[in-house]
C-alpha cells in the first residue's frame, strides 16, 4: 500500500457553553480544528484530527498544524502508511520537533492499519482492557459559585470526575476548590488544574489552604522544577501534564517520583505511536493516566476512546469526550457519552466516517 494523496480540511468547532477559560486569562470561544485524509493506491482512506487549545497553552497552534503538514506531506507521498514506524522516522527527519503537526498523519496511518486488517484500533493498541471508560468534565474558570453550580449539573448527567480550571488569583482559586469540593459526593474525584498558572509561592499557598480536602493538584507551575518543588511540599495526589511532553520527560518524571498521575494528550506527544509507548511505560511503573488530547471533535474523541479502552481501568484515571463540548458534528460513528462513560465502535480503524458536508472542500491537497 502506498500513500497517493494527503487532503487537509479546516473546521470551526463552537462551544456549547460559549467560552472555555483557563489560567492567566486565556480563553477560546471557537476552536480551529484540522482534519486529515490520507488516500492510498488500494482505495482505503485514513482519517485523523488535530485541534490545539489556542496558541498559549502548549507550543502549538491551529495554523501550525496546517503549516507543518505542508512541510511533511511531500516526504510521505509514495510511502507505505502501514509501516507506521517508518512514517514517523520520515517525519522526524523532515521536520524537527512540532509533534502536534505529525500527530494527525500518525493517527490516520493507524486508522488505515485497522481498516487494512479489519480490526478496531483498540485491538491493535493492545486489545480491549475495559468495555467502556470513565470520563471527566472540565469546568471552565469562573466565579466559585458558578463553577460549583456547573459541577452539580454535570454530576446529574453521570460524571463522577471533574477537572477544575484554576491557575488564577490564589485567593480566588482557594475559594473555587472549597466551593466545588463541597457540592460533590465523597466518591467523586476533583482535580484542581492550574495549567502552569501559579508562581511557586502562589502554588504553595493554595496547596496549604486546601490540604484538608480530597483533591488532586495538576500542573501548578510553568516548569518541571517548580512543579516538583510543590510536589515535595504537599501530601495531596499530584498530576503533571504540560511538562510531560514525550517519553524522555516521562522517564525523568518516573525516576524522580515527580507525580502520581500524568495527563497523556495524544497530539502533544506526536500521535498514537508515542502515546502508546508512554501509556505502556506508565503501566509498567504504576502511573495512572488521564487519556485525552488538547481539544477536538468527533475524530479526536474516537482516537482517545480507542487508546483508553485498550488501557486497564486501574491505569485509566479518566478520559475526555471532547465532542460533547461542541455544537458541530464532523463524523458519524464517534463515541457518545452515556452516564459519564464512553466506548468505541467495533468497526475497523477509528470506526468513524467524516461528514464532508460539514468539512467542505480541502484547504490543501498534496499528491
From Swiss-Prot:
SUPFAM superfamilies: Enolase C-terminal domain-like, Enolase N-terminal domain-like. Mg(2+) binds at residues 193, 218, 241. It is an enzyme of class 4 (lyase). Binds 1 Mg(2+) ion per subunit. Induction: Is up-regulated when the bacterium is grown on c3LHyp or t3LHyp as sole carbon source. It catalyses: cis-3-hydroxy-L-proline = 1-pyrroline-2-carboxylate + H2O. Its cofactor is Mg(2+). Changing residue 265 to A: Loss of enzymatic activity. Keywords: Isomerase, Lyase, Magnesium, Metal-binding. GO terms for biological process: alpha-amino acid metabolic process; cellular response to amino acid stimulus. The active site is at residues 165, 265. Disulfide bonds: none annotated. GO terms for molecular function: amino acid binding; hydro-lyase activity; isomerase activity; magnesium ion binding. CDD domains: MR_like. Its EC number is 4.2.1.171. Belongs to the mandelate racemase/muconate lactonizing enzyme family. PANTHER family: D-GALACTONATE DEHYDRATASE-RELATED, ENOLASE SUPERFAMILY MEMBER DDB_G0284701. Catalyzes the dehydration of cis-3-hydroxy-L-proline (c3LHyp) to Delta(1)-pyrroline-2-carboxylate (Pyr2C). Is likely involved in a degradation pathway that converts c3LHyp to L-proline, which allows L.aggregata to grow on c3LHyp as a sole carbon source. Also catalyzes the epimerization of c3LHyp to trans-3-hydroxy-D-proline (t3DHyp), a competing reaction occurring from the same enolate anion intermediate. L-proline, t3LHyp, t4LHyp, c4DHyp and their methylated derivatives are not substrates. NCBIfam families: HProlDhtase. This is Cis-3-hydroxy-L-proline dehydratase. The lineage of its organism: Bacteria, Pseudomonadati, Pseudomonadota, Alphaproteobacteria, Hyphomicrobiales.
Amino acid at each position: 500500500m502506498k500513500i497517493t494523496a494527503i487532503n487537509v480540511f479546516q473546521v470551526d468547532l463552537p462551544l456549547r457553553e460559549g467560552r472555555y477559560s483557563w489560567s492567566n486569562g486565556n480563553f477560546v470561544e471557537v476552536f480551529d480544528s484540522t482534519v486529515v485524509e490520507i488516500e492510498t493506491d488500494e482505495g482505503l482512506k485514513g482519517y485523523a484530527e488535530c485541534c490545539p487549545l489556542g496558541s498559549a497553552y502548549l507550543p502549538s497552534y491551529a495554523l501550525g498544524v496546517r503549516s507543518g503538514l505542508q512541510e511533511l506531506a511531500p516526504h510521505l507521498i509514495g510511502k507505505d502508511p502501514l509501516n507506521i514506524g517508518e512514517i514517523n522516522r520520515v517525519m522526524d527527519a523532515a521536520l524537527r520537533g512540532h509533534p502536534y503537526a505529525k500527530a494527525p498523519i500518525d493517527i490516520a496511518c493507524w486508522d488505515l492499519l485497522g481498516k487494512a486488517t479489519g480490526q478496531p484500533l483498540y485491538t491493535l493498541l493492545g486489545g480491549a482492557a475495559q468495555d467502556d471508560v470513565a470520563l471527566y468534565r472540565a469546568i471552565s474558570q469562573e466565579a466559585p459559585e458558578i463553577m460549583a453550580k456547573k459541577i452539580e449539573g454535570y454530576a446529574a448527567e453521570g460524571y463522577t470526575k471533574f477537572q477544575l480550571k484554576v491557575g488564577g488569583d490564589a485567593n480566588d482559586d482557594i475559594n473555587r476548590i472549597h466551593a466545588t469540593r463541597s457540592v460533590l459526593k465523597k466518591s467523586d474525584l476533583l482535580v484542581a488544574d492550574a495549567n502552569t498558572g501559579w508562581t511557586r509561592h502562589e502554588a504553595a499557598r493554595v496547596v496549604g489552604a486546601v490540604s484538608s480536602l480530597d483533591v488532586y493538584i495538576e500542573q501548578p507551575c510553568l516548569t518541571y522544577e517548580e512543579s516538583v518543588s510543590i510536589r515535595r511540599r504537599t501530601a495531596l495526589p499530584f498530576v503533571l501534564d504540560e511538562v510531560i511532553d514525550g517519553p524522555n520527560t516521562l522517564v525523568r518524571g518516573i525516576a524522580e517520583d515527580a507525580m502520581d498521575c500524568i495527563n497523556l494528550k495524544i497530539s502533544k506527544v506526536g500521535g498514537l505511536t508515542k502515546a502508546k509507548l508512554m501509556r505502556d511505560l506508565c503501566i509498567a511503573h504504576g502511573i495512572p493516566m488521564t487519556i485525552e488530547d488538547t481539544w477536538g471533535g468527533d475524530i479526536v474523541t474516537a482516537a482517545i476512546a480507542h487508546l483508553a479502552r485498550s488501557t486497564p481501568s486501574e491505569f485509566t484515571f479518566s478520559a475526555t469526550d471532547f465532542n460533547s463540548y461542541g455544537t458541530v458534528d464532523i463524523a458519524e460513528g464517534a463515541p457518545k457519552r452515556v452516564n459519564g462513560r464512553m466506548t468505541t465502535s467495533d468497526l475497523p480503524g477509528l470506526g468513524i466516517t467524516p461528514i464532508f458536508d460539514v468539512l467542505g472542500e480541502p484547504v490543501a491537497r498534496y499528491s
